[in-house]
Amino acid sequence: MDHLKHLQQLQNIERIVLSGIVLANHKIEEIHSVLEPSDFYYPPHGLFFEIALKLHEVNCPIDENFIRQKMPKDKQISEDDLVAIFAASPIDNIEAYVEEIKNASIKRKLFTLANTIREQALESAQKSSDILNAVEREVYALLNGSTIEGFRGIKEVLESTMNLITENQRKGSLKVTGIPTGFVQLDNYTSGFNQGSLVILGARPSMGKTSLMMNMVLSALNDDRGVAVFSLEMSAEQLALRALSDLTSINMHDLESARLDDDQWENLAKCFDHLSQKKLFFYDKSYVRMDQIRLQLRKLKSQHKELGIAFIDYLQLMSGNKATKERHEQIAEISRELKTLARELEIPIIALVQLNRSLENRDDKRPILSDIKDSGGIEQDADIVLFLYRGYIYQMRAEDNKIDKLKKEGKVEEAQELHLKVNEERRIHKQNGSIEEAEIIVAKNRNGATGTVYTRFNAPFTRYEDMPVDSHLEEGQETKFEMPTT
């Protein structure tokens, strides 16, 4: 009896809200930001709200005359229901009634979901991981006031497309439609990191891909976006240290050893306060599965609507949900699910990847798409694939190889002299930030051109910087040191 009384009260609340729309048509936009027609318990009320929305779309008055005209022939609202709606007494505090309708709708959907979970759990053929993933998606949809929709009509899609074109026109000559990468020339290729896209950033070890990632993180923060960083290799504190070094222009060595003068301490304090105000979130557990990343991002997005981008360092350290699969199959599954998650949350996801060692055997060590380790479906799933290449790293390795060769030939003194010289040059290079060129190679770009972006890497501050177009150094001149002969 109590339940029946509650339903009668709910119907009355729905009538009052609909009557309020008839009295004040402009309120429908605010109400629609919370409610959908499916949120109404009593079906005729949901149909009434749907008709009212269609009238509002074409700037028609929402009144008794137009409601009756627009009523579909196959779905009629009874005369008694119409009279009850138009006769209901609207109230001033309609927001509370709207929330009550939404609250009741969510409870009904939760009840339905609970029954579905029970039925699926009793089916022995259903895998628990599949059930959990489905539950996560449904709960996330409820938290965001939406449902998992089916087909979208061409009219709706075209309207959305035109809104996007109009928004880009409003931005004028700006070429960045997504989140700025932090590099003007890279933005010219990509138009920034756009929502729903999966971006792969690949490099060999020691190339500095984590530093490049942190540069991109800071760029997104400057665009007032919320940023999530999954760091499976470095602690959050280590990444924060790099960010502070970049922002303060205090080299990492001095920052770690706290050898700072008064001005540097003051600068550090200012940057600390500035960065503390940003929406930057770290998840730095060394072991993480794909389903955990999905759960954490959904939770973070529901708590912080301004979340605009996520970074993962790096993909091959993640674990698949099904341990029985071959590793390349797990990686392919992870990349596919990351792409799906990016579209679901409507954010770009940037995943760092390790490249195959085999590229070291080539004369030209610039990466190509086939160098992606355990590539599987990564290349296929990615909207953009970026590679990082620093010739200076290979120059150092060539110097080390020459020293080893001299030792094997018995030229110990010559090897020691070269070793001392090389170490001193590297120390000066690291401390003083000698000019070093770095290439960001756009190897795949689903919606644009491919090519190479030239930047400078400022080693002491782990900072990548824009380089003017066509001003990059010639091969073998990226530093003041010459490539050693063999």
Swiss-Prot record:
The main replicative DNA helicase, it participates in initiation and elongation during chromosome replication. Travels ahead of the DNA replisome, separating dsDNA into templates for DNA synthesis. A processive ATP-dependent 5'-3' DNA helicase it has DNA-dependent ATPase activity. GO terms for molecular function: ATP binding; ATP hydrolysis activity; DNA binding; DNA helicase activity. The keyword Hydrolase applies. It comes from Helicobacter pylori (strain J99 / ATCC 700824). ATP binds at residues 203-210. Pfam families: DnaB (PF00772), DnaB_C (PF03796). It is an enzyme of class 5 (isomerase). Its EC number is 5.6.2.3. It comes from the Bacteria. CDD domains: DnaB_C. GO terms for biological process: DNA replication, synthesis of primer. It catalyses: Couples ATP hydrolysis with the unwinding of duplex DNA at the replication fork by translocating in the 5'-3' direction. This creates two antiparallel DNA single strands (ssDNA). The leading ssDNA polymer is the template for DNA polymerase III holoenzyme which synthesizes a continuous strand; ATP + H2O = ADP + phosphate + H(+). Gene3D superfamilies: DNAb Helicase, Chain A (1.10.860.10), P-loop containing nucleotide triphosphate hydrolases (3.40.50.300). Transmembrane segments: none annotated. Residues 172-471 form the SF4 helicase domain. Dodecamer. GO terms for cellular component: cytosol; primosome complex. This is Replicative DNA helicase DnaB. Belongs to the helicase family. DnaB subfamily. Keywords: ATP-binding, DNA replication, DNA-binding, Helicase, Hydrolase, Isomerase, Nucleotide-binding, Primosome.
